[in-house]
Amino acid sequence: MFPPSSDLTELNDGQPLSGHHADKPEEACGVFGIYAPEEAVAKLTYFGLYALQHRGQESAGIATFAGTTVHCHKDMGLVSQVFQESKLNEMVGTLAVGHTRYSTTGSSHRVNAQPAVLPTRLGPLALAHNGNLVNTNQLREALAERGCEDFVTTTDSEMIAVAIANEVDKGKDWVEGTIAALTLCAGAYSLVIGTPEGIIGVRDPHGIRPLVIGVLEEETPRYVLASETCALDIIGATYVRTVEAGELVHITESGLVSHRLAESADRKLCVFEMIYFSRPDSVVNDESLYTYRMRIGKHLAKESPVDADLVMGVPDSGIPAAIGFSQASGIPYAEGLIKNRYVGRTFIQPTQHMREHGIRMKLNPLKDVLAGKRIIIVDDSIVRGTTSRKIVRALREAGATEVHMRISSPPVTHPCFYGIDTDSQDQLIAARLTVAEIAEQIEVDSLAYLSQEGMLLCTGEDISHFCSACFNGRYPITVPDAVRRSKLMLENITA
């Protein structure tokens, strides 16, 4: 595909592992990059990815650069499963790029793990991508016309990397090549790209997926790029600012230089990052998302009050909103569900009795807290409703006399095509049923959702600055019909 021009050392091993779906929108991916000569960049990236583990649990990878030599290790599994200290010690360099993955385009297989590493005339590049393109068929055709047809993976991320490498091989530098390649790409992308020269961070013209800049305070600043500020905190970096929508930052030994993409548009940060995906200790718009989620809980209590004895949240994502609901309503807050944080994928089949009570592998109710009580249970979203029904049944079995559910987001009625894995529209319960019908199906005494107006009002920002297509179907980037049919949209054309 491209002439080899560097020493590419792949340190990969592992086997494919099937994906899975929960009764929630599945996380986006996490990206991390660091330029820090004389630092242990692989270890710092490991810890950064550890903080971003919630954004993707299927695979993890790190690529480090020592001049034109790149060491890349990636595999299926959690960050702690993929990397051992001995491996990290082998991965020396002045800069690193890392990724945690949940598949939104391309299936869950080892070959699709990132970073994607490619050779170019200027040396290798390693690309980590959070987001989803919506024009992969057109991009593939455009690359085929340039002679780029031998793809290794089934991901749109590799296609972006190929497009950049192609532009560089035609004579452009790293920044020019990246900007030119991205004119071919439509959709959501936050990219961190490692090169022998430095690291590049870039967000799509709408800024749908997040990307922030941090700095390690030394005599010479060492820059960090990450999906969320929590990844800066874990390595002791200081938050500087957000990479703006349509901005490219180039970090080298000379420092950080900002560039604009050829096309810019109104910023449209995914509002689900605020509600659910990003960690509550991450900062957006100068406040923690914990504070925002408490605020939407307070607003929810004002919009949809109900008389009850206790307010509780579904761990962990429903807790901040539940605390806010409690504060606004004056109804005491209590922990009524205990979460087993060590439940992961298992290949051991449960018994039929366990399947019937399957939620208790993850959440177990406190009977002495719930018995004889009227309960308000707060959660961040309902997608299919199956888990919600199991939780409600468990609460009733524990002695709750009434169960009222409050959801700190509007009904999810449309799938996401910009880097979050939601079900197709016919599988979304709120696209098929009214609120009253959903309440009956999940067996609650009452059900209410936060209004779209309330959700956006609580951001404190202009409502036009957020993508809320999953709630209203207004997609800021046109989604072709072919893309709407399947999240694994590259599988059929790369077999």
Swiss-Prot record:
It catalyses: 5-phospho-beta-D-ribosylamine + L-glutamate + diphosphate = 5-phospho-alpha-D-ribose 1-diphosphate + L-glutamine + H2O. Coiled coil: none annotated. Residues 1-22 are annotated as: Disordered. Catalyzes the formation of phosphoribosylamine from phosphoribosylpyrophosphate (PRPP) and glutamine. NCBIfam families: purF. In the C-terminal section; belongs to the purine/pyrimidine phosphoribosyltransferase family. This is Amidophosphoribosyltransferase. It comes from Synechocystis sp. (strain ATCC 27184 / PCC 6803 / Kazusa).
